[in-house]
Amino acid sequence: MAKQKKQSPGTIALNKKALHDYFIEQKFEAGLVLAGWEVKSLRAGKAQLVDSYVLLKDGEAWLMGAHITPLTSASTHVIADPTRTRKLLLNKRELGKLFGAVQQKGYACVALSLYWKKHMIKCEIALAKGKKEFDKRHTEKERDSDREIQRAMRTKGKDD
């Protein structure tokens, strides 16, 4: 079985599917409005961003489809909704860029990762353009050839 890559210490969750399905044009860092039980769950690493996206409406950005699994010990008096819509905190200039770009055909706004920055949880969102099927195959071929080159470089050093 292949070794799992270690995430950097501040990373809570990654959206690898977005990196596979989209060309990333521009990245933004956004704050999140969270409830207390959500922060506890994120400390435990119980988050998934696989089918999440960013919805832009009424001059605000919202994180949709992100799944934060509630802990069994947390939130006994509050009903925890794991896939609730969460508000993203961006400044007006960044929101303007996102609104303008998403209006263009083919652009989408997706969540790439959740991570800790000091004591706050941040969400990295990206302005992205969808990949076609042949683009995905081309990216996979490039990745395979890079892997072969790296393997050859490692074995070349050991032959000496």
Curated annotation (Swiss-Prot):
**InterPro entries from the xrefs?**
SmpB, SsrA-bd_prot, SsrA-bd_prot_CS
User: GO terms for biological process?
Assistant: trans-translation
Record key words, sorted: Cytoplasm, RNA-binding
Q: Which PROSITE patterns match?
A: SSRP
For the region Disordered, give the residue spans. 131-160
Subcellular localization: Cytoplasm
One annotated GO molecular function is: RNA binding
Gene3D superfamilies under this entry?
2.40.280.10
Gene Ontology cellular component terms for the protein in this record: cytosol
Its main subcellular localisation, reduced to a broad class, is: cytoplasm
One Pfam family hit? SmpB
Lineage: superkingdom: Bacteria
According to its UniProt entry, what is the function of this protein? Required for rescue of stalled ribosomes mediated by trans-translation. Binds to transfer-messenger RNA (tmRNA), required for stable association of tmRNA with ribosomes. tmRNA and SmpB together mimic tRNA shape, replacing the anticodon stem-loop with SmpB. tmRNA is encoded by the ssrA gene; the 2 termini fold to resemble tRNA(Ala) and it encodes a 'tag peptide', a short internal open reading frame. During trans-translation Ala-aminoacylated tmRNA acts like a tRNA, entering the A-site of stalled ribosomes, displacing the stalled mRNA.
Question: HAMAP family, per this entry?
Answer: SmpB
Family, similarity comment: Belongs to the SmpB family.
User: Which PANTHER family does the UniProt entry name for this protein?
Assistant: SSRA-BINDING PROTEIN, TMRNA-BINDING COMPONENT OF TRANS-TRANSLATION TAGGING COMPLEX
This protein's name: SsrA-binding protein
- What taxonomic classification does the UniProt entry list for its organism? Bacteria, Pseudomonadati, Pseudomonadota, Gammaproteobacteria, Pseudomonadales
Name the gene for this chain: smpB
